[in-house]
């Protein structure tokens, strides 16, 4: 029997809403005429969409669409011009927030709970700490001062609201600074560290420390793994179900009298320990954050015992330039900020985010050129990196340029 009108309309709408062309961004490209192309360029409108989704998490505006349809989005220089314009728009903050969520692994802050012993912890505080890190990241990247990666990692200031000045015991100079791009009105750039309670950069933000911890105690393993994987791009295997036939015990929830979290974890890296093969790459870095409890608050004692934040960068097969001991949190982060390996990793994380995939051999030349631009004059300019990514062959083509030969 034929469909009645409502049933027919329902079928049409269902067909539209379940179509791959509605659900996905499809990129067919425009293969050059004749022969087998080494790369398939995106069409101008496809490139405009990819550019807008990466920099704005939104659709192209009229200016970008007009540039695409008018033949002004055809070269790397054209794309760089549009990218520079788009980064000056407040909409750029949304994409940077999404990147920060994934890079620092903090997107699930709304699910973080802590033991009731932490009487100041609440869902509202977790949300504020989360927003602090997102706003600090986007404001640092978009600042007119053209900040570098080192500024992000070593700054003594963060974007906090009045509640967070209490969490950080910040000076009373709150609200003297102006807001940055895309910053909510009540989040201001404020010094969050002091001589008695030091903080350095985004890795010591409360959100980063709290989410990489347990409900009651800090976790040198989680925090060290975060640095190893997210900041150094060095993989550590997931824990096995058992070691030597013995099931992995759950992490400690209490500390015996006179001991610290560190003393509970040191057996992981003890000589001849069956756990040391993996934990030696994580825990000694995580010890560098031991002055911060499970909520990310600064502490000097744990269980009545002084806390030590000394640690070691154990040589990893994937690392070339960062090994040896550090004397505490700020020394550890200073070493990270001075490491070319960290700069390369951050550039690689942006490339992966922009392409929506892990890099392949065919991306080698693009990655090399992107890093060369990023490291110009040792500036490691965060905005310049984004422009370099979008004007690369890998970004502008559906199928990247074959990197089998020498890079130009």
Regions found by a protein language model. Give the residues of each.
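Axial heme c-ligation environment in periplasmic c-type cytochrome domains
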Residues: 355-358
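Active-site substrate-binding loop specific to GH73 endo-beta-N-acetylglucosaminidase modules
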Residues: 1-341, 347-348, 352, 365-377, ...
């Amino acid at each position: 029997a034929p469909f009645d009108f409502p049933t027919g309309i329902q079928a049409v709408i269902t067909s539209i809403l379940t179509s791959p062309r509605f659900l996905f961004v499809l990129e067919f490209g425009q293969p050059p005429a004749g022969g087998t192309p080494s790369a398939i360029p995106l069409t101008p409108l496809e490139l405009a969409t990819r550019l807008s989704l990466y920099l704005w998490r939104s659709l192209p505006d009229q200016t970008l669409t007009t540039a695409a349809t008018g033949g002004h989005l055809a070269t790397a220089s054209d794309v760089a011009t549009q990218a520079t314009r788009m980064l000056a728009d407040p909409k750029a903050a949304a994409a940077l927030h999404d990147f920060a969520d994934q890079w620092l692994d903090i997107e699930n802050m709304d699910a973080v709970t802590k033991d009731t012993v932490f009487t100041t912890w609440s869902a509202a505080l977790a949300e504020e700490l989360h927003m602090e890190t997102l706003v600090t990241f986007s404001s640092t990247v978009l600042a007119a001062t053209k900040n570098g990666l080192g500024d992000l990692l070593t700054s003594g200031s963060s974007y906090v609201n009045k509640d967070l000045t209490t969490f950080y015991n910040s000076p009373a100079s709150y609200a003297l600074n102006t807001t940055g791009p895309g910053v909510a009105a009540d989040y201001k750039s404020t010094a969050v560290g002091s001589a008695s309670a030091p903080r350095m950069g985004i890795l010591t933000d409360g959100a980063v420390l709290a989410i990489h911890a347990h409900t009651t105690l800090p976790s040198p393993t989680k925090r060290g793994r975060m640095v190893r994987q997210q900041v150094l791009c060095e993989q550590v295997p997931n824990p096995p179900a058992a070691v030597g036939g013995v099931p992995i015990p759950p992490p400690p929830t209490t500390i015996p009298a006179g001991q610290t979290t560190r003393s509970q974890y040191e057996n992981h890296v003890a000589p001849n320990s069956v756990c040391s093969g993996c934990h030696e790459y994580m825990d000694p870095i995580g010890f560098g954050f031991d002055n911060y409890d499970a909520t990310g608050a600064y502490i000097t004692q744990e269980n009545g015992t002084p806390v030590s934040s000394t640690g070691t960068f154990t040589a990893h097969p994937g690392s070339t330039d960062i090994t040896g001991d550090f004397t505490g949190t700020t020394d550890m982060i200073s070493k990270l900020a001075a490491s070319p390996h960290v700069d390369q990793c951050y550039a690689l994380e942006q490339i992966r985010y922009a392409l929506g995939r892990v890099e392949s051999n065919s991306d080698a030349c693009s990655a090399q050129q992107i890093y060369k631009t990023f490291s110009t004059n040792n500036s490691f300019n965060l905005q310049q990196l984004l422009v370099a990514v979008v004007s690369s062959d890998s970004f502008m083509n559906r199928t990247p340029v074959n990197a089998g030969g020498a890079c130009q």
